[in-house]
A protein has these predicted regions:
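Glycine-rich phosphate/pyrophosphate-binding beta-alpha loops
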Residues: 2-4, 29-35, 82-83, 119-124
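Short, solvent-exposed loop/turn segments at the edges of secondary structure
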Residues: 8-10, 36-37, 58, 86-88
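A structural signal for short hydrophobic beta-strand segments in well-ordered beta-sheet cores
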Residues: 15-16
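A generic structural signal for beta-strand entry/edge sites
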Residues: 19-23, 39, 88
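A short core secondary-structure module
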Residues: 25-74
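Glycine-rich beta->alpha junctions and the first turn(s) of the following alpha-helix
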Residues: 72-173
C-alpha cells in the first residue's frame, strides 16, 4: 500500500460490513499482473483490537474482488525496467461493494493467509533475479569483447577479466541459492 511498505500495521485499505456486503476503501500499489487479472485477492483491515500487551493492532481479512465490482478500478501500469511481461498496476477501492460470502478464510486471519501465499512466490522472484543476472553477464561479456581501448578489446585487460570472473562467480553462487 502507499506509505505502508512491508509494515503490516501500515495497512490502510479497510473493509466495513454493510448488511450483506463488505465495503472496501483504499488502494494497493505494485500489484503483479493487475492489468490482466479479472479476479483479485485483497487484504483489508476489518478490525482494530488491542494485543496482549495492550497495544493497538489491526486485524486483516482476505477478500475476493472481481474487476467488474462497483467501486473497483485498476490504475495505470507502472513503467518498469524489467519483467515487462507482467503488468504491474495500482488497485483502487472507492466504496467497492462485494458480497459477504467473498471473504476468504477466517475474519482477522488474512495477514497469515497472505504471508503463506507470498512464501511460495519467493522462489519465483529469486529465479527471475537470477535470470536477469545471467542475461547481464552475457551482455557484459559480449560488450567487453567488442569494445576497443588502446587498440585492443577491453576483454584482454586483466582488470576486466577479474571483474568478469567475480560476476561469473556471483551468478554461479546464486544458482545454488535458488
Amino acid at each position: 500500500e502507499p506509505g505502508a511498505g512491508t509494515d503490516a500495521q501500515g495497512q490502510q485499505t479497510i473493509a466495513k460490513e454493510d448488511g450483506d456486503y463488505w465495503v472496501l476503501n483504499g488502494s494497493k500499489i505494485f500489484i503483479t499482473n493487475a492489468g490482466f487479472a479479472d479476479v483479485f485477492i485483497v487484504i483489508a483491515v476489518t478490525d482494530n483490537v488491542l494485543d496482549k500487551r495492550g497495544r493497538p493492532t489491526k486485524l486483516c481479512s482476505a477478500f475476493i474482488v472481481e474487476r467488474t465490482d462497483p467501486g473497483f478500478s485498476v490504475g495505470k501500469a507502472e513503467d518498469k525496467m524489467g519483467i515487462r511481461g507482467s503488468s504491474t498496476c495500482e488497485l483502487i477501492f472507492e466504496d467497492c461493494r462485494i458480497p459477504k460470502d467473498r471473504m476468504l478464510g477466517v475474519r482477522g486471519k488474512g495477514f497469515q493467509l497472505a504471508m503463506a501465499t507470498l512464501d511460495g512466490g519467493r522462489i519465483g522472484i529469486a529465479s527471475q533475479a537470477l535470470g536477469i543476472a545471467e542475461g547481464a553477464l552475457e551482455e557484459t561479456i559480449a560488450y567487453v569483447k567488442e569494445r576497443k581501448q588502446f587498440g585492443r578489446a577491453i576483454a584482454a585487460f586483466q582488470n576486466t577479466q577479474f571483474e568478469l570472473a567475480e560476476m561469473k562467480a556471483r551468478v554461479e553462487a546464486a544458482k545454488y541459492l535458488v
